Amino acid sequence: MAIEKELLDQLLAGRDPSEVFGKDGLLDDLKKALSERILNAELDEHLDVERSEGTAANRRNGSSKKTVLTGTSKMTLTIPRDRAGTFDPKLIARYQRRFPDFDDKIISMYARGMTVREIQGHLEDIYGIDVSPDLISAVTDQVLEAVGEWQNRPLELCYPLVFFDAIRVKIRDEGFVRNKAVYVALAVLADGTKEILGLWIEQTEGAKFWLRVMNELKSRGCQDILIAVVDGLKGFPDAITAVFPQTIVQTCIVHLIRHSLEFVSYKDRKPVVPALRAIYRARDAEAGLKALEAFEEGYWGQKYPAISQSWRRNWEHVVPFFAFPEGVRRIIYTTNAIEALNSKLRRAVRSRGHFPGDEAAMKLLYLVLNNAAEQWKRAPREWVEAKTQFAVIFGERFFN
């Protein structure tokens, strides 16, 4: 509903235009006046309800002052009171000292990778609000309950494709800062949209940890994964197939290429990439193996033998790639979504140095993922072709 021009003219009369949006300006005055108007209307309604229910007579009993934090300022409100003490306003509850948008603003800044000290400085510089680090931490800690609910939410029965990947995060643990792996599972649903299944901070080494993750996915309702794309970690494929025996485990081709280039001097990387392309672009597994042998015997394979050794170690989980038609291969190979996701996560943790504990790391990473979720609501163009091929290859499993 538009505000009448005459009313706006009255509000602006005699005011310096440059101060309208500043601290203690017209906007803050309006917030205060509207808030107090709402509080008085709430008390009137509360008293009317009590009278209609035949409750003992209750009436207004003066007011009290309360200083509250809004999203942009600090404001002292006159809170009306009732004699019986039964009035608890909805706008700003009895023991509440912050408007919800204030908490939302802090959480939004935290999700963008700002540290507690940076948020404190930002609120002071922009809004003139002095907020303690403890209060900021208390606000962001509210997210932990949402993290627990999200991490334990029910899953779909079947996911056509799940990418399992990891980033390294520095976390203080038992007095030492450790470089821990944080695993993320990005799933592609039958309609081509994406969903993060969960986040897990590595607590133990190897297969036992991954087996626990797989069992957790199953206990949350996931009964089948058609293709799992992993980054070549030893023991991970066995953990997946122990819980999901029908799952095809595929080594991530992009990770394998990157690992190969770690052995190559910078000036040689550009010509090595097309030489490797002949392997994973081969028409089938037999042709792929011949291309690997040709690379191994060629100039680059002789100069960097560790590359072909790496491909041979992972060959068992490279082979499934060749059995898929081009549409499915493209979806498996195109890791834009997981790469973009990891980029957001790394950017958020980079400014932190290290986290004081696992909960602090989970809190931030969850918020980053939550902000990115809007981008996954549309299926990529490639999914139209891939979906048909998934349905042909996997039949009824795809439609579960």
From Swiss-Prot:
GO terms for biological process: DNA transposition. GO terms for molecular function: DNA binding; transposase activity. Pfam families: Transposase_mut. Keywords: DNA recombination, DNA-binding, Plasmid, Transposable element, Transposition. Transmembrane segments: none annotated. It comes from the Bacteria. Belongs to the transposase mutator family. Required for the transposition of the insertion element. This is Probable transposase for insertion sequence element ISRM3-like. The lineage of its organism: Bacteria, Pseudomonadati, Pseudomonadota, Alphaproteobacteria, Hyphomicrobiales.
